[in-house]
Amino acid sequence: MNRKTKGNTNLPLIVALAGSVLALLGLFIIDAMAEPEPFPEFELEDGLTSKSVTRDAMMGEAWVAYFSATWCTHCHPTLDSIDLVIPDDRLLVFNTEVADSDMVGWNEDMEDYLERSLDRPFIHAPGLATELEVFGRPYLIFVDAEGNIQSDREGLWTDANEMAKVWDETVSA
């Protein structure tokens, strides 16, 4: 077999590989250019103060939606960490349970566990959780100042430094 023939047999492989690389690059560019997903509109009651909480009231600054449930004991360490990172008025605690829950009791249980005051809204929001397809707990959604979802994370998360980095990226978005 001469060299010319051998080189031609690799050509389809090279073309396929180059095509794959270009396809992946195209997907990356499309994803990077995609419009951010807006956090849905909501108007719900803070179970601690009975005041209305809306998405519009959170606009203008970045914020975090923390989804959990009263029975989720493995969620406690995540709330502990995120509470230390996120400024006082920038974190909303949403309850995903369908059945009505005692938000005051939940807040008190969390304060006892954390051994500090939690001055955050505790909001019964199973419909919002369903709309956002929140199935795992805890679930965090980082929302930019314009109301767009910048990132999300499901499951136990206690690395406050990593949370602070994601928070800073959200604030800068």
Language-model segments: which ranges?
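N-terminal targeting signals for export/organelle localization
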Residues: 1-45, 173
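A short beta-strand-turn-helix
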Residues: 41-63
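Loop/turn elements at helix/coil->beta-strand transitions in domains of secreted/extracellular proteins
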Residues: 59-63, 87-92, 118-120, 137, ...
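Short pre-active-site segment immediately N-terminal to redox-active cysteine/selenocysteine motifs
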Residues: 61-63, 68-71
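Cofactor-binding loop segments of dinucleotide-utilizing enzymes, especially the Rossmann-like FAD-
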Residues: 67-69, 94-96, 145
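The canonical Cys-X-X-Cys-His
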Residues: 72-76, 140
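Structural microenvironment flanking redox-active thiols in thiol-disulfide oxidoreductases
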Residues: 76-114, 124-131
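Thiol/disulfide oxidoreductase modules built on the thioredoxin-like
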Residues: 116-118, 124-168
